[in-house]
C-alpha cells in the first residue's frame, strides 16, 4: 500500500513537471531573434537584395577608387555572413573600384528556405547570378574567400577552367583558413552531429541558443583575439535572422559534398594558372598547423602563402584585420 502511494505521488510529480515544462519549452522555441545592433542594422540598411530563382539574396556593393578597373568579390565562411568582412571593407575600397560581398543562401540576411537542398554548386551559381545582375559578368574578378567561401571559390575556379557558360573570369584567388582538404579538416563536435542529418538534427537546431553558439564558436578564435560579447551577438543575430538556426544542419552538408567532390575541387586548385594566395591563421583548430600547410604547399607549389602571427586562428580577417589586409595587398600588388 505504501509503495503504491509512493508510485502515485511520483507519477503526479512527473505530470506536474511535464505540465510546467511544456509551456516553458514552447516559450523557448518561440524566442524572437535578437534586435540588430546599430552597426549590424547599418550594414543591412546599406546593402541591397537581388532575386535568384524566387529567393532574396543580400549583398553589399561599394564603389571605391575612381578610375581603377579592379573588382574584388568576397565570399564569407560558415556559419556567419558577409559582415565578417566589415573590418577590412574600407581598406579594400582604397584599392579596388568595386568591393562586393553577398550573404550566401541560408546565411545572414539572405533567404533561408526549408526544406531545401543546400549545395556548394548552388552557392557558386548565386555568385555568378549576382555578377550578371550587376552587369559585371564579362569583367575580370579578384576572389577573396574564407572557410566555406573557399569551397565556393574552388567550384567557381573549376567552372572557369572548364570554360563553362556563365562562369566568372577569375583574375586572382586568395583563400583563407578554409577546409579545402577533407583529410586535414577538423569539424567541431556540433558540426559532426549535425552534418549527417540524423534524428537529432532537428532537435539540436531548435534547442540551439546564444549560449551554445558562443561557447562553440569562441574556441576557434585565438586566445588574445576572441570576439566581444557584442560581436558574438551580431553573429548570432545574423544566424537567427529568418530562423537560420533551423537550416544549419542542411548547410553543413557541404562537409559531405567536399569529401565527395574532392577530386573536382582540389584538382581545380592544383592545376591553377592564375595568381593564387593563402592567408593563414596558424592557431586554427579546424585546419591545424602544420598538417594543413604541409599538404597545401605540396598540392599547390605555385601558390604563395602569408602566415599571420602565432596567436591568430580561424577568423584572421576579424582577429588581425590589419595583418590580413596587408597580406592581401601584398599579394594583389605582386602581379
From Swiss-Prot:
Record key words, sorted: Endoplasmic reticulum, Glycoprotein, Hydrolase, Membrane, Transmembrane, Transmembrane helix
InterPro entries per record: AB_hydrolase_1, AB_hydrolase_fold, AB_hydrolase_sf, Epox_hydrolase-like
Stated family: Belongs to the AB hydrolase superfamily.
Keyword Ligase in record: no
Tissue: Highly expressed in hydatidiform moles, but barely expressed in dermoid cysts. Biallelic expression is detected in blood lymphocytes. Seems to imprinted in an isoform-specific manner rather than in a tissue-specific manner in lymphocytes. Isoform 1 is expressed only from the paternal allele. Isoform 2 is expressed from both the paternal allele and the maternal allele.
Compartment(s): Endoplasmic reticulum membrane
The protein's name in its UniProt record: Mesoderm-specific transcript homolog protein
Gene this protein is translated from: MEST
Transmembrane segment boundaries: 13-33, 63-83, 266-286
Amino acid at each position: 500500500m505504501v509503495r503504491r502511494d509512493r508510485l502515485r505521488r511520483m507519477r503526479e510529480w512527473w505530470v506536474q513537471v511535464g505540465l510546467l515544462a511544456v509551456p516553458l519549452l514552447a516559450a523557448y522555441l518561440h524566442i524572437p531573434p535578437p534586435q540588430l545592433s546599430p552597426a549590424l542594422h547599418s550594414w543591412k540598411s546599406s546593402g541591397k537584395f537581388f532575386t535568384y530563382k524566387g529567393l532574396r539574396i543580400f549583398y553589399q556593393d561599394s564603389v571605391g577608387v575612381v578610375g581603377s578597373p579592379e573588382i574584388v568579390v568576397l565570399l564569407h565562411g560558415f556559419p556567419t555572413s558577409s559582415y565578417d568582412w566589415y573590418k577590412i571593407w574600407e581598406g579594400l575600397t582604397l584599392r579596388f573600384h568595386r568591393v562586393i560581398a553577398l550573404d550566401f543562401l541560408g546565411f545572414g540576411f539572405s533567404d533561408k528556405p526549408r526544406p531545401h537542398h543546400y549545395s556548394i554548386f548552388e552557392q557558386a551559381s548565386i555568385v555568378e547570378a549576382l555578377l550578371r545582375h550587376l552587369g559585371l559578368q564579362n569583367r575580370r574578378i579578384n576572389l577573396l574567400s574564407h572557410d566555406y567561401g573557399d569551397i565556393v571559390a574552388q567550384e567557381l575556379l573549376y567552372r572557369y577552367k572548364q570554360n563553362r557558360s556563365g562562369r566568372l573570369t577569375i583574375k586572382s584567388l586568395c583563400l583563407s583558413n578554409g577546409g579545402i582538404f577533407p583529410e586535414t579538416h577538423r569539424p567541431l563536435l556540433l558540426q559532426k552531429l549535425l552534418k549527417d542529418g540524423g534524428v537529432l538534427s532537428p532537435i539540436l537546431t531548435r534547442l540551439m541558443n546564444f549560449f551554445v553558439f558562443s561557447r562553440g564558436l569562441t574556441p576557434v578564435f585565438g586566445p588574445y583575439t576572441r570576439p566581444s560579447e557584442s560581436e558574438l551577438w551580431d553573429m548570432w543575430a545574423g544566424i537567427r535572422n529568418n530562423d537560420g538556426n533551423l537550416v544549419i544542419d542542411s548547410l553543413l552538408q557541404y562537409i559531405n559534398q567536399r569529401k565527395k567532390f574532392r577530386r573536382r575541387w582540389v584538382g581545380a586548385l592544383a592545376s591553377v594558372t592564375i595568381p593564387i594566395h593563402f592567408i593563414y591563421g596558424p592557431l586554427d583548430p579546424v585546419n591545424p598547423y602544420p598538417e594543413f600547410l604541409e599538404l597545401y604547399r605540396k598540392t599547390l607549389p605555385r601558390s604563395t602563402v602569408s602566415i599571420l602571427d602565432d596567436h591568430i586562428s580561424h577568423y584572421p580577417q576579424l582577429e588581425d584585420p590589419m595583418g590580413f589586409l596587408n597580406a592581401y595587398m601584398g599579394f594583389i600588388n605582386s602581379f
